[in-house]
Amino acid sequence: MSRLIIPSHSPNEEGNVVRVTPESVGWEYVGFEVYVLAKGQTLRKETKDQEACLVLLKGKANISTKLERWEQIGLRMDVFEKVPPYSVYVPANDVYEVEAMTDVEVAVCLAPGKGTYPARLIPPSEVGVEIRGAGNIERRVHNILPESQPADSLLVVEVFTPEGNWSSYPPHKHDQDNLPHESYLEETYYHKINPGHGFMVQRVYTDDRSIDETMVVKNGDVVLVPKGYHPVSAPPGYEGYYLNVMAGPVRTWKFHNDPDHDWVMESKLAAKQKEK
């Protein structure tokens, strides 16, 4: 198996099914965890020197921090309902507790924090929804924690790719600290597939091909993007979902398209305009 794939596993005692830490994968900024909790189960964690964004992938829960509490939050029972999720931002040096009111799947997105901002609820009404691309590179995007919203390091977004379409396309990268043209951001992809026995295809490659891997990605896999371009393809019959977590030295998303394929977006958008 590729070193860029972290597969999920059966829930352990605290419900964890996948965990990525900077130490475990050899980078500096992004951490990512997913917990599957049975109704009535409680997860309690300290954030320490990291900030967290808890994304309720499915189910309803009570979530509390040192100073705040939100009850019965959660709107969707499956990510493929395609409605924006409830999320909770938790600063560094805080504590969060998730009490499952139904069966719950919660993603914990992590990055270095300074405790600048207080804990807050991110309701579905505050999640920006956009349709990005056109034709067979069109996808639905939910901007959960974009750079326009306060956080110290984290950027969080979820994307739905229709069957037969490509996503994160044209291929782009953000691996150079070269602002204002490009930012350095590590990234994780947490993949879900509908139906669940299907697969996605993701390629991660650099200009010099020091990394060039094309991977078959299964339901629940995490793909690591330490650097390079990273397009995704959804085969016919299977729609894809992924939750992205990004973080780096500067909290801004400035990307650079692969010049060999940059023309594709302009061509697709022009074709879409002709159809109107």
Swiss-Prot record:
What EC number(s) would the UniProt record show?
5.3.1.30
Mind listing the GO biological process terms from this record? Answer: inositol catabolic process
Give, as one word, the top-level EC class.
Answer: isomerase
- What are the record keywords, sorted? Isomerase
- Pfam families the UniProt entry points to: KduI
Molecular function in Gene Ontology: 5-deoxy-D-glucuronate isomerase activity; glucuronate isomerase activity
Annotated pathway: Polyol metabolism; myo-inositol degradation into acetyl-CoA; acetyl-CoA from myo-inositol: step 4/7
Reactions it catalyzes: 5-deoxy-D-glucuronate = 5-dehydro-2-deoxy-D-gluconate
Q: What InterPro entries would the database entry show?
A: Deoxy-glucuronate_isom_IolB (IPR024203), IolB_Bacilli (IPR023770), KduI/IolB_isomerase (IPR021120), RmlC-like_jellyroll (IPR014710), RmlC_Cupin_sf (IPR011051)
Query: Is Isomerase among this UniProt entry's keywords?
Result: yes
Q: Which family does it belong to?
A: Belongs to the isomerase IolB family.
Q: Which HAMAP family match?
A: IolB
Purpose = Involved in the isomerization of 5-deoxy-glucuronate (5DG) to 5-dehydro-2-deoxy-D-gluconate (DKG or 2-deoxy-5-keto-D-gluconate).
Indicate what this protein is called per its UniProt record.
5-deoxy-glucuronate isomerase
Organism of this sequence: Geobacillus kaustophilus (strain HTA426)
Q: Which gene encodes it?
A: iolB
